[in-house]
Amino acid sequence: LHIYVDRRPEFQKSYAFFATNYGGMDMKFHLDGQWRDTPAGVAHFLEHKMFDTKDGNALQDLAANGASPNAFTSSAMTGYYFDSTEHFEENLEILLSFVSIPYFTEESVAKEQGIIGQEIRMIEDNPDWQLYTRMMQALYQKSTARTSIAGTVESISHITAETLYDCHKAFYTPSNMILTVVGNVDPVHVADLARRILPREGGPAIPRDYGQEPAQVAAKETRMAMEVSAPQFLTAYKCAPAADGEDYLRTAVLGDMACDILLGDSSPLYQRLYEEGVINTSFGGAFEMMPGVAYLYAGGDSKDARRAAAEIQREAERLAAEGIDEDYYQRVRRASFGSNLRGLNSFENIAVTLTEGYFHGYDPFRFPQVFDSITKEDVAAFLRRNLTAERAVLSEIVPREN
């Protein structure tokens, strides 16, 4: 197990984050000599069930001990964490124990299917969720990135206790996990405790299959009518994915910079569309990366989604052709660097950043050097390569007509 301790002796609070390199996209993998196909939503379902122990519930144990525990599942990671000002080592022991010792019964799985099924029905009624999910399904034909992390009511009905044990065996092994601790702690004590509780064997590396994704998008447009007061849109671009290593960090920084320069609230595009009433303050964008995929998207409320999407495309082409104004580039660069730096004030942010770096084979603390190496020409080239009309999709949610 890889352990990372960031000592902060001046703080009362300590934070522990125990994560596995396993998330919603990891549906097909090779275990015990054969390929396994698992239903959509298993990683998220497993995260919910991990808190069950033979003696009760680890969430309650941690809370009773003064800790604030929680967990999340993303497309490529599942993380369990807590922060506390007292009984830190005791709480860490509880965390490491319940995550490494699975306990599932068919009864508890059936009960959870009802609970998560209700959650899924609720999120399916959420316009933001539909807008984003339909955008992903328009972007991707084969990649499991197009699948909702929670799965569907139908897909989770196929999950059994055996499915959960198999996935735990495959991915909850020390070699596929990392423990990150930030705060007023003794690194030696943390390592000793982990050594005492966790299994000695690392476990083999598990091959995964995310699907062979073609360069073309799956669908250019998707539109759905729902109970919303104003029409909403997301336009997205299917970008070239990055390999693990420093290239992954560089692509992440480059994509974020491109996003800020093209779409940020001080950008010429934002100012113009806002003044013309095409967008409002709900408008925003982001660049995301997952195993084998990367995409840049933007949107918000708009009465003219097609015009907004066309203007974003036009501005990307203009910046790619004419280049980026030097003063504007430096201003955005400083703001972007500053917000990355401020992120280091948050214990949770540090832990998640270190974890992502470890899973993707780069050192996140090298971001100042990577930042310095990126030029405005690099950003223009990124826009030229990735933000083309063929790579674009449009997802819309419109008010239902009574």
Describe the role of every protein-language-model region.
Residues 138-177, 211, 340, 356-385:
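Histidine-acidic residue clusters that define the catalytic metal-binding segment
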Residues 234-241, 261-302:
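A structural supersecondary motif
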Residues 205-211, 284, 322-332:
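Flexible, glycine/charged-enriched surface loops at secondary-structure junctions
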Residues 32, 49, 79-83, 103, ...:
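Second-shell loop/turn segments in exported
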